[in-house]
Amino acid sequence: MSSKLLTIQLLEELVHAAELNQEGKTADYIPELANVNQELTAIAVQALGEKTLAYSNNPLHPVTLQSTGKMIPLIGLLEEFGADQLFEWVKVEPSGDDFASITRLEQFGPKPSNPMLNAGAIALCSRIPGIGEQQFRWLEHWVQKLFNQRLSINPLVFASEKRTGNRNRALAYLLKSRNNLGADVHETLDLYFALCSYEAMLDQMLYLPTLLANRGKDPDTGEQILSTETCKITLAIMATCGLYDETGTHMVKTGMPAKSGVSGYTIAVVPGKAGIVVLSPRVNAKGNSIRGEIMLEGLSKAMNWHFALP
């Protein structure tokens, strides 16, 4: 199957095709997320060895990571402690349940099913080394490493997460009751809410998926930032668990390992070829960006980037 050239015109076509879909809405259960422009639709692609291309239908502004931030403790702990230790804290199996499922943890715990679920990310946050401020410095260190720059925490979103995060509190206390939380509940949740509340511009989101696409090497300098083993494990988890109970549908349509967030960001990886980020805050009931998926499917078809196609 022949592929198109990767051009700004192609990205513009993908955005305009996605704009036709009016389904979904902003995630209003985190009040600050409801205040964004729900028509914002954007895409950026970094093909290895080529310049970054991006297109947006509206002026861009910083958007919080939300669940794309779950990549931070996963990758950081993999690098520092290794896979064997990480898998003592969390499993790597698709759950078939929504991202904040309590039932799944009750029935199949004490280990959360995978690091992409809220319970899994909370469990990993409790394993961040240090106490208090040391743990926040650990987060800052890994944000710097995985985004190639510092990011800021949006204080309004952080406060909103803390104020409304009762389901996450329930998950944390359930983990604690099963002896699978490595630290204090409140301190762990502060870390979790913080990583969800980091905010980034579209172009700032592109470094991490491009790093993973390039086997852990900085796409500009060639410096080995992450081990190839960490990249392999991370991409496998993204491919099987990155969009919760919609991951199978996503992989059938796009063939790209990806990680979504309810803010509207989805990062995707074409191993050996490209890093991608799409943005649209119109999300479905599963917490995934509807227009984002339309853009990723269109890009995959246009570029012949589905993993299952030769």
Swiss-Prot record:
Keywords: Hydrolase
Catalytic activity entry: L-glutamine + H2O = L-glutamate + NH4(+)
Entry binding sites for substrate: S67, N118, E161, N168, Y192, Y244, V262
Domain of life: Bacteria
MF GO annotations: glutaminase activity
Assembly and oligomerization: Homotetramer.
Matches recorded under NCBIfam families: Gln_ase
Matching Pfam families: Glutaminase (PF04960)
Family under the similarity heading: Belongs to the glutaminase family.
Name of the gene this protein is made from: glsA
EC number: 3.5.1.2
Annotated InterPro entries: Beta-lactam/transpept-like, Glutaminase
Protein name as annotated: Glutaminase
GO BP term, pick one: glutamate biosynthetic process
